[in-house]
């Protein structure tokens, strides 16, 4: 992995107010970096949550605290003009109360008094086609639930030795979540 290019691309995404493209970054850098090189870098191999952990692990170790909080979130990157696929599809957006077309992704932040760092993520893939009985239309659904993704991310945080006191999540947890070597009881208010 080309860490300097990854850092540059991440900075570009964070600092941009509008649409971001490889061509846009190349233009911003006055063609000192070709858009083809950026595109090749982005399509080299799938970037996983484990890759993210390897990058942020040294930072987490510097700031880790027993009273840290894991904040899990569910977001949608809107892609209204892109063709539907396993990754890009229709998702219910709780902020607008409507279905929107885009990429649904789940994130986990490790938050201390000092900083918030991303430590895990999952992409919601609607990898199964089915026929809606009411409309007769072909639709897509995920074979792995968001709850299962959240549990996987939580287990990874425990396995990676991140100390934390609380977990904040946007979905209702199951009664018992097996995490690491023990079970953690969850309660709904």
Report each predicted region and the residues it spans.
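Conserved, well-structured functional cores that handle cations and Mg-NTP chemistry
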Residues: 1-188
